[in-house]
Amino acid sequence: MAPEASPERSCSLHTCPLEDPTGAPVPPPTVSTLQAIDPTSPLTAGHFAFPRAPQDYQEGSSLLGLGDQASLCAHVSNLSTSIDTSQHDGVWKQPSVQRHVVSVRQERTFRMPKSYSHMIADWPVAVIVGCLAFIFLCTLAGLLGSPPLDFSEPLLGFEPRDTEIGRRLEVWKAMQALTGPKNLLSLSPDPEMNSSSLLSTLSPAAWGRAEESVVRTKRMVGPVEVKEEENFFCGRPEKSHAKLVFVSTSGGSLWNLQAIHSMCRIEQEQIRSHISFGALCQRSAANECCPSWSLGNYLAVLSNRSSCQDTTQADTDRTLALLRFCATFYHRGVLVPACVGSSQDKPPFCAQVPAKCTGSNVVYEFLHYLLDRDFLSPQTADYQVPSLKFALLFLPIIKTSSLLDIYLDGLGDPIKVSDNYTSISGMDLGLKPRLLKYYLAEDTMYPLIALVVIFFGMSLYLRSLFITFMSLLGVLGSLMVAYFLYHVAFRMAYFPFVNLAALLLLSGVCVNYTLIFLDMWRLSRGQVPSGGMPHRVGRTMHHFGYLLLVSGLTTSAAFYGSYLSRLPAVRCFALFMGTAVLVHMGLTLLWLPATVVLHERYLAHGCVAQAHGQRGGSDPLRLLLALHRRIRIFRKIISILSRLLFQRLLPCGVIKFRYIWICWFAALAAGGAYIGGVSPRLQLPILLPLGGQFFRSSHPFERFDAEYRQQFLFEDLPPNEGGNLPVVLVWGILPVDTSDPLDPRTNSSVVSDPDFSPSSPEAQEWLLALCHGAQNQSFFGDQPEGWPTLCLVEALQQWMESPSCGRLGPDLCCGQSEFPWAPQLYLHCLKMMALEQSPDGTRDLGLRFDTHGNLAALVLKFQTNLPYSTEYGPVHHFYTEISRWLSTEMSKAPPGLNQGWFTSNLELYSLQHSLSTEPAVVLGLALALAFATLLLSTWNVPLSLFSVAAVAGTVLLTVGLLVLLEWQLNTAEALFLSASVGLSVDLTINYCISYHLCPHPDRLSRVAFSLRQISRATAMTTGVLFASGVIMLPSTILLYRKLGIIVMMVKFLGCGFASFFFQSLCCFFGPEKNCGQILWPCAHLPWDAGTEDPDEKGRAGPPGFSEHYELQPLARRRSPSFDTSTATSKLSHRPSILSEDLQIHDGSCCLQHAQAPVSPRDLLLDHQTVFSQCPALQTSSPYKQAGPTPQTWIRQDSQGQKTEPLQALPEGPAHCPKSKVEELPDGLCSSASTLEGLSVSDDTCASEHSVRVPDSVGTSPEVMNGTGHPILERGQLNGKRDTLWLALKETIYDPNMPNSHHSSLSWKGRGGPGDISPVMLPNSQPDLPDVWLRRPSTYTSGYSS
């Protein structure tokens, strides 16, 4: 303390009244550390008063920062006396009582921080404000410099771009959109002769939808004559009408009167009674809503009833007999619309059909549209009572988004659309895109609830709402900065909807970082009890900063690996998510430690003080206090169970059963690889993303597409209407996609081939040969009418010889029989043929003319005999066969036609081809980038390989489980699989870095060290993310559900592989010391501390005196008394710390001078570090008081004058300092052994045979020579325990001191400046001397636990 005359001065956290009875002025302070003072010094206890320190400082719960305006300092005596000096005397003397002299000095209000830790500790508010200002500026620039978010088309971007097939499809779509009268390309050479059409004014996307509508209409059966009885309906049902599928509630047949009446009743109550139905329905000539095409209405028409409800059972029986009779002709293919009616120009085969089957359209439409394909099929026609499983109802409403109100008010409720007989199980209302947008906004609550669960679990673990809130703010800030970089720095124009998933995924990364940092922060309090806030920040960030950099870089690299995909949405997500992880890593380095320092300094003490200060008051207050006490009791129980699980059971279980864990997880990974890649493997999609699955499988919209659509015969494609794959050959336009591959909203334009020349004689001959060669191929099929023929040259020859050649007047082309023709004549004749056969510019002859009337391109088509399929295999065979044939032909083409290419209906195949090849490549690249990042960060090959093996096992098992869950490899699944590496890599890196930074050289101790240090935070992270995934399962949107499943599965499996598989691999093959390490010059590893060369140690400080005492090697046989002696030693009055973290010490046994730190601060750092890492050997049986245990030492100053014997400071077993402000988590004690949990097991506590027992350093006080120097002597062990390692982490033990006093003062005596006194190892035999070991003053940069 300072002299009494010093005025009272205030620190930032404490008020320190200082008094000086002598009135002497305060000498200027030199350092800011606590140091023991020699009693003969002028600054001894007699000169100072020791007032009561504040409560929080006494308990060791808070650390003063070096940046306080009034710092707590200590004076350093200039005397040369020390403990080292006293050891030169011939007699051992009791050391003096350690007394701390504290003074207060005034410092400058503002000063520049000396280092990163000083900046965080001294200016936490400034750091946080600076980060907030940076986030605000980036957010403002990102919002102002980018277009507003548009999620109107959430599935946009899931079609492959920038692939060979994709480029050709984009160019072909652009050519179709730009072809027409008054357009860039035309079918006629003279645009003035063509009238404008609707298609020329449509955009490419709108034109495609219009063409699709035309194609769908053409596939419908053509109109036929309507009979008088059919005037009940408004025409015939079309595919464009809204459809409902009815099933039986009881599982029986729908062909009964009760079920038919039930369907009519549900339609009337839930659809026709809706207020919007009248405005949407199709109306008859009488301006009334047309009746529905339903089972009951067709039955009423055949039975001459006025409505569905008037039908009887006899009507159903009579109609069933008629349908049974006519079904035979329908399935034979002779009952077709052409045979229906009374017209005379029927096909000849219609004579086979009886008149009662063709007298009306009702019978045909009954069988073709309303009944499922199995009802009255040839296989079930002989059944006495056929079963109708599904019945279709066509509403007189065109499929449109206007049906949303009807769906939400009635059809969307399963209870309203079902009764005791029937229920609506499937729907096709054309509402999937519109309903997707609705549910995307409606189900957003599930991801938000998942976020609440994540941060609520974090707050329970941290016990701080402030840190939790700041962590959430850091996540949001990181996303906003990433959004700024995404748009402004990377120039990305498209922001897909899937990028919003980054909020949930980045929150999981934040939880992992925050929990680990807080564990290390609490741990550093016990390791650095008096080092100040800057040293505590530096101590924590020494380990956490390394872990954060490695984890952040590896995770972002894994996400960036997905950029290799050709799906624009996946590439945009990879870029945004990888950038967000990097930004969050950078902000965490500043934001998180500053937040914790701010909480530690201003919030933690105040909150606890208020809680302890309110002891009385009203009944509600007492009730709250009672509840608080119960919660604390429950929390203590959870803490005890957590300590038992993560500090004892988990390390023991991993190390003891490591053989089982390796085999089990390797088998799981191999099984996942086989299931996902061989059989049954992930199935490719059979629908395009716009027609794919949006909602969960039980949704009626999805059930109609997946189950019911193929149950009705009208959905089948007729064999002569687009059933086969066409081939489109293009010359004159290069297959170059000019659109932005990362923006699916952009459309490509056409790029002309400058070398295109189809008029040369060689080109004419080659085109004719190409026609004949294609006709001889096995894939060439029958050509439909009106198609542009592949044989353009033959068509021109036929036209020249036909009478129609001269229809436009005399021309040079007519009658030309010489071949090949002159180039100018050839081009002129092609133009004349186009004008004659397509005067309005609507017939496609395969010619494309530009605006000047010149031939710009050739587009020739032919039909193959290969049927279109949604399966990948047949279409892949078609594509490879056509590509091989065309490549061969193009190799023979003349220079003007050698740039030709082909395309077809390959949209689905393009997606399937990308999904069949890219996920494996993307996952492999992500794993390779993760390995490279780990290797560059740790420079350790085995650890990098083991980490990547654990991540790969997680991904393989995830894929296998997804196959068992019947997932298809669709676009969403490809996105989540590409992100699985980034989601699972951080948990493994936690253990990898903790293992790498462990100061212990042997692999078992390092495995236990990493498990005890990281496992609880890893388990908590996995738990909260698993819970968040469960929360998202009830969502209607399939994207949310699958995101929840992926998060659950990847995090759970990743935790298992990291905790058991990776650690078990390290138990077997983990690197020891420098094994597998890529060494660089001047490299210093954590476990190299204490093994420096004596000469190097001599240069570290002034010379001193040091003795080395060598113990006898331990036996390799384990004693039966292992467990008994361990248990009794814990119950004895002397400290015993079980450990297997033996530090290898290669020092020699000769006399050499010990090194003292050059400054008290260095002394403090060295002393604390060594005490937590330098082990020794100790006997373990119950201690005997009869042994010769010295109680006092006699100290001697430099002049040889003896001082009074002083009692040594006692110190009990090492433990965590218990604080009234905040309890440390169990298992985070700095002095606890890394394998303390293994001491209870007789099987797992044995050391490896490969680990040698090191030499220890010691000096015996009983054996001294005449000059006061110790005599080296072998120590004795009683042999009761073999290969047991004990860590020296205590000061001198005093048996007269109570155990409670030992516990309360153990942390205070540890690490004090100048405390390098020897430590006694009591022998269990009363007739043998104890062993005394000298504490070396060696500083190591390792991080101890």
Swiss-Prot record:
It is a multi-pass membrane protein. Keywords: Glycoprotein, Membrane, Methylation, Transmembrane, Transmembrane helix. Its main location: membrane. InterPro entries: Dispatched_Hh_regulator, HMGCR/SNAP/NPC1-like_SSD, SSD. Gene3D superfamilies: Multidrug efflux transporter AcrB transmembrane domain (1.20.1640.10). Residues 429-598 form the SSD domain. Residues 1-28, 1251-1271, 1295-1345 are annotated as: Disordered. SUPFAM superfamilies: Multidrug efflux transporter AcrB transmembrane domain (SSF82866). GO terms for cellular component: plasma membrane. Belongs to the dispatched family. This is Protein dispatched homolog 2. It comes from Mus musculus (Mouse). The lineage of its organism: Eukaryota, Metazoa, Chordata, Craniata, Vertebrata.
